[in-house]
């Protein structure tokens, strides 16, 4: 799947900045259709008033935010530009953004299943390929030289994962 991302000129995550900050597809840019406060407001309205009221306000906010992106980030792209658009599940938010870009004339594509589907694909791929690797665990007391051993193994060209080093221990 990741190799297929090369078919696109850009990968656009339209989720809120908070969602994007938690995790996103590597290399994606964040052009949110709802900011953090707007997303919370829509969620509250959906649960406390009605889905209809939330969708009505959401459509107005999303439309306004897409217009802002068109007048700023997306101003200079040529007609041949090919963006891939995604949100959490590949539904309303990315659907609205993709629809507008396609109506303009760009060849926008919506990521089926959204970020949730992307994560599922990556996890499934890791689970399928895990048996192709040989994992060796090096353990020992603090100060016993585990990091030094891993560094030597890495210098020989082997792939290593130094969890203590990553944790700055």
Question: Which residues does each PLM region occupy?
Answer:
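Long, charge-dense
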Residues: 110-123, 131
């Amino acid at each position: 799947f990741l190799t297929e991302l090369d078919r696109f000129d850009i990968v656009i995550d339209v989720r809120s900045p908070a969602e994007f900050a938690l995790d996103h597809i590597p290399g994606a840019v964040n052009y949110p259709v709802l900011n953090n406060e707007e997303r919370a407001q829509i969620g509250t309205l959906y649960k406390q008033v009605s889905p209809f009221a939330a969708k009505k306000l959401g459509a107005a906010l999303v439309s306004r935010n897409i217009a802002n992106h068109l007048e700023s980030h997306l101003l200079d792209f040529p007609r041949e530009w090919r963006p891939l658009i995604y949100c959490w599940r590949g539904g309303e938010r990315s659907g609205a953004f993709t629809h507008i870009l396609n109506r303009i004339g760009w060849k926008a594509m919506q990521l089926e299943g959204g970020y949730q589907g992307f994560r599922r694909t990556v996890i499934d791929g890791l689970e399928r390929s895990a048996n192709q690797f040989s994992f060796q665990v090096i353990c020992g007391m603090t100060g016993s030289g585990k990091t030094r051993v891993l560094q030597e193994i890495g210098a020989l060209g082997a792939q290593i994962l130094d969890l203590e080093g990553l944790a700055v221990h």
